[in-house]
Amino acid sequence: MPDHGMSRLLVAAFYAFTPLDDDQREALLSALPTQASHGAVLGSVLVAKEGVNGTISGPEQGVEGLLEHLQEQLKLGEQHFERLEVKRSWAERSVFRRFKARRKKEIVTMGVTGVDPRANVGTYVDPEDWNGLVDDPDTLVIDTRNHYETAIGSFDGAIDPGTDSFRDFPHWAETKLRPLIDETAPKRIAMFCTGGIRCEKASSYLQHQGFGEVHHLRGGILKYLEQVPEEESRWRGECFVFDQRVALNHQLEPGEHSLCHACGLPLSPEQRSLPSYIKGVQCLHCIDRFSESDRQRFAMRQRQMDQLSSASSKKSDDFSL
């Protein structure tokens, strides 16, 4: 775990599946921005009938204060199905530009009614027990994340569904996974995602649809990277995150990937060195996707961003004098 001195900011990814009525949701949506402002916390929190899901960053005291506020308001306990699941990491600077609390139909969008992890969910697997499970040849390991996430890192031998969004998972499960299970007859399924929320909902779906014995990694990849030593790890590559860090390495520090600001996909240093890459304008993934007028507009935007960055750096240098 990296040193988190006074200059570092705490980043917390969290979720809880807990039923919220209209009054509870409105109370949270009203109180969270005030709580965040008092603690200098930035980020995003989704509030729905099924619970809360968010990632926030800021001074440690402010972030922990907001998490405590959520724990109290939601009246959560310590059972798997009712706790506020939190993954913590650190950053040198803010990874968000603002704070938003938003009302949503689902805290992670699958688009299937009747899926409730509180009522029906797979077996939770702690990070220290994950290696033994996935090393078993009778275990079918599934990465429930999107294709652009799996492209930069995953567990050894995991199946990549190749989805564009989590909404695609049920269709993939019915059209690809079910025939695969019929053919190979694995003893169990083991699933994982970034922080645990998607695989928890996916395992609930598979259980409900009769896919057999289903397990999922508690706390997701982030908790695994936090608790399992790198020399014992089955993880390969970097873990995509939905904030300005883009990806994290095994030490939960910002990795080497950055986003193409034209298409939004992550790029490795090698991909950024290709002739097809023009910063802010195009990359190997989108070179044929946009029109010439689009690329001119992207180039103008990049020049403006570079000018703002240069001006900001000059102000910092002047202040340091």
Swiss-Prot record:
Molecular function via GO: oxidoreductase activity, acting on paired donors, with incorporation or reduction of molecular oxygen
Catalytic EC class: oxidoreductase
Region called Disordered, residue ranges: 301-321
Superkingdom of source: Bacteria
Biological process terms in GO annotation: tRNA modification
Active site: C193 (cysteine persulfide intermediate)
Main function: Catalyzes oxygen-dependent 5-hydroxyuridine (ho5U) modification at position 34 in tRNAs.
Residue span, Rhodanese domain: 135-233
Protein name: tRNA uridine(34) hydroxylase
Family listed: Belongs to the TrhO family.
EC number: 1.14.-.-
Reactions mediated catalytically: uridine(34) in tRNA + AH2 + O2 = 5-hydroxyuridine(34) in tRNA + A + H2O
Keywords assigned by UniProt, alphabetized: Oxidoreductase, tRNA processing
KW Oxidoreductase (keyword) present: yes
